[in-house]
Design a protein with these regions (language model features):
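Thiol-based oxidoreductase modules, predominantly thioredoxin-like and allied folds used
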Residues: 50-61
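Local sequence-structure signature of Cys/Sec-based thiol-disulfide redox active-site neighborhoods
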Residues: 15-43
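N-terminal amphipathic/basic-hydrophobic helices that include classical n-h-c signal peptides
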Residues: 1-13
Length: 97
């Protein structure tokens, strides 16, 4: 009960899930900067606040053309936030916004 109203448990869970950020790392095999970016994100200490997806740019000609020389590229909720390196403090700030 909140303020005299009963809030179904599933609504609380749905709100929690919908407030998580969706992070995508565009990368390719053998990219050491991609490995560093992924490790930085995974070790940022806020993994409960986002879902992480890694996309190999070699699997899509358009992504390969777009990001060939700029990986890793990291997006948060569809907005490009980082190229080449991830600033951990800025990443954490963006996840908590």
């Amino acid at each position: 009960m909140v303020g005299g109203l009963f809030i179904p448990f599933f609504l609380i869970i749905m709100q929690e899930v919908s407030s998580r950020r969706h992070v995508i790392i565009y990368s390719r095999p053998g990219c050491h900067l991609c490995d560093e970016a992924k490790a930085t994100i995974q070790n940022a200490g806020c993994s409960d606040r986002f879902s992480l997806e890694e996309i190999n740019i070699e699997s899509d000609d358009e992504l390969l053309r777009k990001y060939k020389y700029d990986i890793p590229v990291v997006t948060i909720d569809g907005v490009e936030r980082f190229r080449h390196r991830v600033n951990v403090a800025e990443f954490i700030r963006l996840i908590h916004v």
